């Protein structure tokens, strides 16, 4: 890590693979490097493990919307936030699979299914398992986000062939209780451990723009990087202020700060896919381009992201053409060694 923070006469130091644990102080030094140096180093690390011009394409479907009992301050789906969102029942399996087929036709290689639950009930597990098995039969990667999981539920999803489980930590441990009180930071880490122990890959990241400090953002990434095995996928979301939610009037995130966070995620977790997730509709094409330069190599495609707007596929296709980017093929979605 010391090599990464070394700078001599403005010239960047050599870039070792960052495979060891990271401290908050080391991460702060890296984050605060001159912007050009930070992006240069992040791009070097990125090219060491991935095709720098390939972007992994995922599609996210809400299979059960609204009515969640949690009190997450940012969320349109919390029953405690008067956002006007109507709750729905769990979607039928065949409808989910029909949407998955459309996603594959649109270029997605990973299909993510999200349910607004505190945790899945046993009565719903059979349908959830059938969804995983059905999507796997389409030769797509599968991901689910269903709330907290027990070890037994994790094992059942693993047996069905689930590739990834998403469970974000959202923010730093210090700031966490300012955003959510109905489950603890440790609860989230426990679910991540259950998923990992079952052999499912982990997808875990957070949200920027909830009133946290820059140090909170850095701390969140250090927590993820220092898990026994870092997440294979790290979604970085920009808050979408939802009318009726507690964060409806939150101040926007500075785009340069957002790009710095992407770069730090890439350097601290060099083998992870760093996903430019919610909030892309609020980003300029130039900001997104800087994020890709900083090491982001995954996006959600489609016009909606759970209940939020997302750039349309035509816009993403045009942006990729302008930047010379290409969809990542399924067989190349694993990180390679330093080349």
Swiss-Prot record:
Positions binding [4Fe-4S] cluster in this chain are 68, 72, 75
Q: Which InterPro entries match?
A: Aldolase_TIM, BATS_dom, Biotin_synth/BioAB, Biotin_synthase, Elp3/MiaA/NifB-like_rSAM, rSAM
Keyword Cell wall biogenesis/degradation present in the record's keywords: the answer is no
> EC number(s) for this protein?
2.8.1.6
**What is a single molecular function from GO for this protein?**
2 iron, 2 sulfur cluster binding
Q: What does this protein do?
A: Catalyzes the conversion of dethiobiotin (DTB) to biotin by the insertion of a sulfur atom into dethiobiotin via a radical-based mechanism.
User: What name does the UniProt record give this protein?
Assistant: Biotin synthase
């Amino acid at each position: 890590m010391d090599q990464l923070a070394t700078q001599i006469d403005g010239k960047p130091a050599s870039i070792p693979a960052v495979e060891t644990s990271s401290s908050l102080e080391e991460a702060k030094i890296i984050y605060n490097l001159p912007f050009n140096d930070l992006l240069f180093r992040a791009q070097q690390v990125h090219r060491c493990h991935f095709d720098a011009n390939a972007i992994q394409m995922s599609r996210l479907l809400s299979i059960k919307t609204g009515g969640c009992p949690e009190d997450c301050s940012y969320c349109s789906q919390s029953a405690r936030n008067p956002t006007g969102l109507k709750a729905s029942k769990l979607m039928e399996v065949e409808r989910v699979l029909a949407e998955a087929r459309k996603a594959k036709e649109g270029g997605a290689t990973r299909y993510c299914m999200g349910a607004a639950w505190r945790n899945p009930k046993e009565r719903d597990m059979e349908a959830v398992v059938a969804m995983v098995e059905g999507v796997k039969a389409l030769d797509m990667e599968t991901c689910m986000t269903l709330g907290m999981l027990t070890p037994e539920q994790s094992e059942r999803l693993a047996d069905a062939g689930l590739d990834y489980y998403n469970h974000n930590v959202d923010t730093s441990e210090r700031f966490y209780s300012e955003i959510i009180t109905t489950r603890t930071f440790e609860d989230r880490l426990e679910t991540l451990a259950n998923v990992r122990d079952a052999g499912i890959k982990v997808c875990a990241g957070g949200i920027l723009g909830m009133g946290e400090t820059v140090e909170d953002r850095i701390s969140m990434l250090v927590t993820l990087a220092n898990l026994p095995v870092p997440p294979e996928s790290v979604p970085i979301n920009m808050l979408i202020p939802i009318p009726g939610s507690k964060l409806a009037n939150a101040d926007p995130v500075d785009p340069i700060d957002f790009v710095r966070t992407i770069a730090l995620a890439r350097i601290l977790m060099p083998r992870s896919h760093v996903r430019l997730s919610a909030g892309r509709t609020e980003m300029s094409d130039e900001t997104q381009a800087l994020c890709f330069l900083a090491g982001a190599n995954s996006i959600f495609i489609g016009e909606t992201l759970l209940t939020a707007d997302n750039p349309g596929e035509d816009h993403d296709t045009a942006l990729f053409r302008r930047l010379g980017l290409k969809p990542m093929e399924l067989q190349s979605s694993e990180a390679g060694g330093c080349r």
